[in-house]
Amino acid sequence: MASHKDVKKVVLAYSGGLDTSIILKWLQTELGAEVVTFTADLGQGEELEPARKKAEMLGIKEIYIEDVREEFVRDFVFPMFRANAVYEGVYLLGTSIARPLISKHLIDIARKTGADAIAHGATGKGNDQVRFELSAYALNPDIKIIAPWRDWSFKSRTDLLEFAEKHQIPVAKDKKGEAPFSVDANLLHSSSEGKVLEDPAREAPEYVHMRTISPEAAPDKATVIKVGFERGDAVSIDGVRMSPATLLAKLNEYGRDNGIGRLDLVENRFVGMKSRGVYETPGGTILLAAHRAIESITLDRGAAHLKDELMPRYAELIYYGFWFSPEREMLQAAIDRSQEHVEGEVTLKLYKGNVMVIGRESGKSLYSDKLVTFEDDQGAYDQKDAAGFIKLNALRLRTLAARNR
């Protein structure tokens, strides 16, 4: 076990579930530390008042439960979507992007309450331990961090349940055995991993999907919506302006009802292993398609292509936990500069798991009818100019061909 004997007061990222309740009691009994709890409402869809009651029952005096949904979407999700960030070609980073926000609040509460440490419930095998801790150290280089899953002596679920029983921590009857899979959720997405999902050759059971109906069960009639953008951020649906969190929640409803946003993938974790996950990102999938569509008529080709080159690196930084790094902030500044004229409206058709762009318009559009028309362009484009353009671009190819023949 790492030495935490000098820790007096700890801020714990607390869900109210069995695992973090055991961690709470472990911090009290094994370290003798005073515990402050922080529970974030990230739009996970759970009632959070039970977390307060359970913390009170376990003797906690300082309890923080905060609604961070608007901050989450405005300051973390939307900046990420300006970049069109996708990890390994498919993953929209729903879990990754929530961790720096949680760490930020843990550090803020530690400063406010005079705590000298923070604690989290991430295991020693996953990415989240890295994300939580890199973010925390970036915000407070002197903070102590306790990760009980790396420190304690419990070897099995039975050990945890025995500890819970010994310390009178309530255990729901359906928690006596291990859950069939692990779940993480927020307003952007839900992820399911482990247990029944560990064999990547087997299809995930339908009951794993909690955010969307199956595409096969989706309506036979398509849903058509319009998403409005300003400076790269979605601001309206069908002409109705909404706050960031409200807008994403509405897109989630459209995605859910049309079976959109399911993903079954094997990803490369930062710690080195491969992991199979089943993710649902209904609103985010719609948002990404809409954002790329509005960029297609408002971004210059050079800027658009450079963004696409930078995106995998930007996505990696978020996945690995470097949200608060200078390189991510540098990339963000460039991305945000590119979004100054990304405004307008995109029309999308949602149908049985598919998001189809069927229209896009903008007062800042670079699309020119005169240039692309198949009819008389009235001198807007002289096709004779193409001959010289091609000849100059072919110069090196012709030189190579002449040498090699």
From Swiss-Prot:
The family line of this record is: Belongs to the argininosuccinate synthase family. Type 1 subfamily.
Residues at which L-citrulline binds: 91, 96, 127, 131, 182, 191, 267, 279
Give the record's GO CC terms: cytoplasm
Biological process, per Gene Ontology: argininosuccinate metabolic process; L-arginine biosynthetic process; urea cycle
- The encoding gene is argG
Cross-referenced Pfam families, in alphabetical order? Answer: Arginosuc_syn_C, Arginosuc_synth
EC class, as a word, reads ligase
In terms of CDD domains, this protein maps to: ASS
Q: What is this protein's record name?
A: Argininosuccinate synthase
Coarse class of the primary localization is cytoplasm
Keyword Ligase assigned to the entry: answer is yes
Q: Which residues bind ATP?
A: 13-21, 40, 121
